[in-house]
Swiss-Prot record:
Coiled coil feature spans: none
InterPro entries per the UniProt record, alphabetical: ARM-type_fold, FHIP, FHIP_C, FHIP_KELAA_motif
Source species of the chain: Culex quinquefasciatus (Southern house mosquito)
PANTHER family named among the record's database cross-references: FHIP FAMILY PROTEIN CG3558 (PTHR21705:SF11), RAI16 PROTEIN-RELATED (PTHR21705)
Low complexity bias (residue ranges): 569-579, 781-792, 830-889
Chain residue ranges for the region called Disordered: 558-579, 759-922
Annotated protein name in UniProt: FHIP family protein CPIJ015043
Length: 997
């Protein structure tokens, strides 16, 4: 029967006349029967058998190969005319099923391989219907899987034009060339094509012919880059999202935007190619990406002058940086930011720094978020260009205080400093909370005394199950744990850098030279003479060569006499010289201090004895994290020009912009302050004493041209203390502000669960999401994306919802279920306790869903932070959700998860584009403007309007709460950094790493 079926199939194409519809239909029917019989035989052949047992018979397969039926089928299909695509579709199905079930057994038989190569070769440069394209891509994918498992079969699919036409030509990898046109396709077709191409890229690592073909003759790299640029040009030029706290594109936003989905698919594919491809292919693709996408496409987009276009371009850049993971791609992005030749001498990084000073709150927020993303790369070159090159010579620190830079002892006083610089009203609040907690656990007499202290503080916390205590994180240990995790991760990344950035004192260099620890006696002698010569040159127009020569002669005589002494006498003489030199240097330093000089001119001599290649064997550097500065680079720090300078040292545009934004802390938008404090805390994580000298060391004064960080903190404290005095009214305002921020925290923590419940209750519909306008102004076509389908129900402190209550384990009543089904629309049923409010604060009961949720993706966090109390945060797997104020390390995860609670229509002018620092026509965003009656916000937000105090006082109260929690976080970071420095001092110094000082 099987042989009859195969024979009848062969009779159909013996007729050379034109094929009718019935003939084609008959062949297709017989092909189905033939494939079924062949699959049954292949199934029996693939079964495991005992050694030495005879192979099972396969008459159908033998007949198929012996009679060359597949070759005849191909020749017959060429003559089918208008039915050619239908016949080709059936042939592709046949090959697909046989290849997938036979593994590689049939590919080694010429009667099977020859017609397969013919049909593949004839498919080049052809346009097929979608169903034929789908089958072709599936077949190519199956072939790539088979070749990946059997690399020795690769040569079967390499053939040149000479083999067909006899006129020569380069070798062609037919499978790869057929897949290239489908690399940017949408849907499953493009996904399977990209998977197959990745398998081919992986094969290039195993077979040199594949790597040579792809790198030399294939057009995959230009196709990928041009396609990526084309997909970027299709992205909306303006992102119009009705939310004041929007700052980045999340993963959920990508899935809601088809254009962005295609772009990200292409970008992720490029990232995967760089990861698995041959070295030649990888380098070629990186060059094309830099020259064909970053410079001509992304660069001009970032340099646009329109604010809305700048916001969208920077949002796309932030998404790109967060999405790529391969070091090669990150390296060219860093190179793109630092390039000075491609954009008329203007660096992209400098442009981004300038936008930190923008008066547009949205542009400022997204710029702060972008720099937070860039800092998370832990890239040495970026840190060097942003800050370290301005701090390396330590000119910002007076001479008399430079010895403190590398010491860890004064860190203890810095911890107390940050706690003491908090606003007085917050100290009063913390005292009241501590007293209330103590009296609540004590006698009834203590409870009576609580009302005499404050009738408001702590009153709004009972529905959360407990008072939070000294911090909104419920425990200072939570800050310590989070700071420890972040500092450890950052230090581990910075250990791969080429250089250790710290200030090297003179005494250390002299001691190492005297003791033979890296400098010869002649080097130290020359060093001291040069130092004295430079110092004396500051006071005379002509260099006092005679004095220096006398000193030089004296040094030479001492050196000659020391050669005639015994080793013990030489050692004693060296110690005496060292003491004399130290006294001279102390006198010079005191002279500079008494004269008001800020620094002393020191020219460092870097050690040349370290081996540059020794550390390469012990660890693997990630090239993009490591600076392009070579390890054996000699850094010459000439400080002579700074000897008489006072207050003229610049910390660089980046730190200057951050300090300037911090000075307007009380006038900034709340969300700008959250991003700003988070960025500064991120800087404090780095294990860089030079950076600590301006952030975590209040005992070290600075001589910069702007107020120091600690001076700004004192100014903010004085400003808040002056406008928010310690009184009962201020305590009440602060209490409302704390409750507002706690309510915001629990909305973030329970966002995912509330989003699901919201979709169930609202039927998947919600308020309008962000609108993406393609083009400038209002002339472009608009693309509306319903990102608000995951909008969570807003929970207020006045509601009966208990965040610590477990899920209800009671069984649902069938009667109530049927009653709810058949209830009339106008009837009132049982209310859900989770959606009802008690009216204890707002005086009314309402259901208040949040207005937008375009950011609700929780990224994985490696911090491994845990909760020290139930009221801290919830942790699921490796995802972290921050504290309610999102201070420090946890702030980043919470901002990633943050939903948008405000809409522009319900806000006055200035919320979305408020000025920072008081300039401009539009005022800064205030909390009062965030809670307009009837806008659907929580009762707590409404109480901000109807509460006591002026609008300015309510805004200052929120600033005071944020500042207080941030200072506690900085205190915890300082404490943990001191422990890290102590541990590093006790461990052995790693060899072969140069010290940049």
């Amino acid at each position: 029967m099987a042989k009859f079926t195969l024979s009848s199939t062969g009779y159909c194409w013996l007729n050379n006349r034109g094929q009718s519809h019935d003939d084609v239909l008959g062949v297709v029917t017989h092909l189905d029967h033939m494939v079924t019989l062949l699959l049954v035989e292949l199934h029996h052949c693939n079964k495991l058998s005992l050694p030495g047992a005879p192979a099972p018979p396969a008459p159908c397969l033998e007949h198929l190969l012996s009679e060359n039926l597949l070759d005849k089928l191909y020749e017959w299909g060429v003559k089918t005319g208008r039915y050619g695509n239908a016949v080709r579709l059936e042939q592709l199905k046949l090959y697909e099923q046989l290849v997938s079930h036979s593994r590689h057994q049939l590919l080694v038989h010429e009667p099977f391989l020859r017609p397969l190569l013919k049909i593949l070769d004839s498919s080049q440069n052809e346009i097929y219907p979608p169903d034929v394209e789908k089958r072709l891509v599936i077949l190519l994918n199956q072939l790539c899987v088979a070749l990946m498992q059997n690399v020795h079969l690769l040569d079967l699919f390499f053939f040149s034009n000479a083999q067909q036409n006899g006129n020569g030509g380069h070798t062609n990898f037919i499978i790869f060339s057929l897949l290239i046109p489908y690399v940017h396709r949408e849907g499953s077709l493009g996904h399977q094509a990209r998977d197959a191409l990745l398998l081919c890229m992986a094969l290039s690592q195993k077979n040199s012919n594949v790597g040579k073909y792809i790198a030399t003759y294939s057009s995959i790299c230009p196709v990928l880059v041009t396609g990526l640029g084309g997909l970027y040009s299709r992205l909306p030029n303006q992102i119009d999202i009705k939310s004041v706290d929007w700052y980045r594109i999340t993963t959920d936003d990508v899935t809601e935007m088809p254009e962005l989905t295609l772009f990200m698919n292409s970008l992720e594919f490029c990232n995967a190619v760089v990861q698995v491809a041959h070295t030649a292919i990888r380098q070629q693709l990186l060059d094309f990406l830099y020259q064909g996408f970053l410079v001509p496409v992304l660069g001009p987009a970032i340099l646009q002058t329109n604010v809305e276009s700048q916001v969208s371009a920077m949002a796309y850049l932030d998404l790109i940086v967060r999405s790529v993971s391969e070091p090669g791609l990150i390296q060219i992005i860093v190179r793109f930011l630092l390039d000075t030749d491609k954009f008329d001498g203007q660096r992209i990084l400098d442009v981004l720094v300038e936008r930190l000073n923008s008066n547009d709150s949205r542009l400022c927020m997204i710029t702060l978020s972008l720099f937070d993303t860039l800092l998370a790369l832990n890239c040495e070159d970026l840190m060097l260009e942003l800050m370290l090159k301005y701090l390396l010579n330590c000119q910002h620190v007076p001479i008399s205080h430079r010895y403190k830079v590398n010491r860890s002892d004064p860190y203890g006083s810095a911890v107390e400093y940050f706690l003491n610089v908090a606003p007085d009203i917050m100290k009063k609040v913390n005292n009241v909370l501590n007293t209330n907690n103590y009296n609540g656990n004590g006698s009834s007499a203590g409870n009576g005394g609580r009302q005499t202290i404050s009738k408001t503080i702590g009153a709004n916390w009972n529905h959360y199950g407990m008072n939070t205590g000294e911090t909104l994180l419920a425990s200072y240990q939570a800050y310590l744990l989070d700071a420890r995790n972040r500092i450890t991760q950052c230090k581990h990344a910075c250990d791969q850098w080429n250089n250790i950035y710290r200030y090297q004192k003179l005494s250390k260099l002299v001691n190492s030279g005297v003791n033979g620890g890296g400098h010869s006696g002649e080097d130290v002698r020359t060093y001291k003479v040069q130092m004295i010569k430079n110092f004396l040159a500051e006071f005379t127009t002509t260099a006092p060569d005679s004095a220096v020569e006398l000193l030089l002669d004296q040094q030479q005589q001492d050196h000659r006499s020391s050669q005639c002494q015994s080793p013990a006498q030489q050692h004693l003489h060296q110690q005496q010289q060292l003491q004399a030199t130290t006294k001279q240097l102390d006198s010079l330093q005191s002279l500079g201090d008494s004269s008001g000089y800020e620094s002393l001119n020191i020219m460092t001599i870097c050690s040349g004895g370290g081996s540059a290649g020794g550390s390469e064997d012990g660890r693997r550097h990630e090239s993009w994290k490591v600076s392009s500065v070579k390890e054996d680079t000699v850094v010459d720090l000439d400080l002579s020009e700074d000897l008489f300078a006072q207050g003229t040292v610049s910390l660089g545009p980046f730190l200057t912009a951050i300090w300037g934004k911090l000075q307007t802390f009380t006038s900034n938008c709340l969300y700008v302050n959250l991003h700003l404090t988070g960025l500064i805390s991120h800087l404090a994580w780095f294990p860089l004493p030079l950076l600590h000298s301006i952030l975590l060391r209040p005992d070290i004064p600075t001589t910069s041209d702007t107020p120091s960080f600690h001076q700004v903190l004192k100014i903010l404290k004085q400003q808040i203390d002056a406008e928010l005095p310690e009184c009962e009214e201020s305590l009440e305002i602060v209490d409302v502000a704390r409750s507002f921020l706690v309510d915001r925290e629990f909305r973030l923590i329970n966002m995912r669960k509330n989003a699901i419940e919201s979709n169930v209750v609202l039927g998947g519909s919600g308020p309008g999401g962000p609108r993406l306008s393609n083009g400038g102004g209002g002339t472009g076509s608009s693309i509306t994306s319903s990102l608000s389908q995951t909008t969570p129900m807003q929970l207020t402190p006045s509601s009966s919802y208990d965040p610590f209550k477990r899920n209800d384990t009671k069984r649902k009543s069938i009667t109530n279920s049927f009653s709810s089904i058949f209830r009339r629309p106008g009837s009132s049923g049982g209310s859900n306790s989770n959606n009802s409010t008690s009216g204890s604060l707002g005086g009314s009961s309402s259901v208040t869903p949040s207005l937008s949720a375009s950011q609700h993706h929780l990224p994985p966090s490696g911090s491994g932070s845990s909760n020290s109390s139930p009221s801290t945060t919830t942790t699921t797997g490796s995802s972290g959700v921050s504290s309610l104020l999102m201070v420090g390390s946890s702030r980043r995860e919470s901002r990633e998860a943050e939903t948008q609670f405000m809409d522009h229509p319900s806000l006055p002018v200035g919320i979305g584009s408020g000025t920072v620092g008081g300039g401009g026509a539009a005022g800064p965003a205030s909390l009062t403007s965030m809670a307009q009656p009837g806008s659907g916000h929580s009762s707590l937000e409404y109480s901000l309007v109807n509460g006591v105090g002026s609008e300015r006082q309510r805004d200052l109260a929120v600033c005071a709460v944020v500042l207080d929690e941030w200072l506690k976080e900085l205190s915890a970071i300082t404490q943990e950094q001191s422990l890290v420095m102590v541990a590093a001092a006790t461990s052995e110094q790693q060899p072969n790493r140069s010290v940049v000082s």
